[in-house]
């Protein structure tokens, strides 16, 4: 299970809404510090 998590964590995150919400919160905090990327 740990190996699968390292290889493809995104699927596990998307399957868990609580984890997804926390994941997005961390990304928002990260970009708030370094500045948002240009797409």
Curated annotation (Swiss-Prot):
Listed under GO cellular component are:
extracellular region
Say yes or no: keyword Signal present: no
Q: Which UniProt keywords apply?
A: Amidation, Neuropeptide, Secreted
For the biological process aspect of GO, one term held by this record is: neuropeptide signaling pathway
Where is this protein found? Secreted
InterPro entries listed in its UniProt record: Pancreatic_hormone-like, Pancreatic_hormone-like_CS
Which Pfam family is an annotated match for this chain, by its short name?
Hormone_3
Give any GO molecular function from the UniProt entry. Answer: hormone activity
User: Has UniProt tagged this entry with the keyword Secreted?
Assistant: yes
Family membership noted in the UniProt record: Belongs to the NPY family.
Phenylalanine amide-modified residues are 39
Entry function:
May have an important physiological role in neuroregulation.
Taxonomy of origin reads:
Eukaryota, Metazoa, Spiralia, Lophotrochozoa, Platyhelminthes
- Coiled coil regions in record: none
Protein name according to UniProt: Neuropeptide F
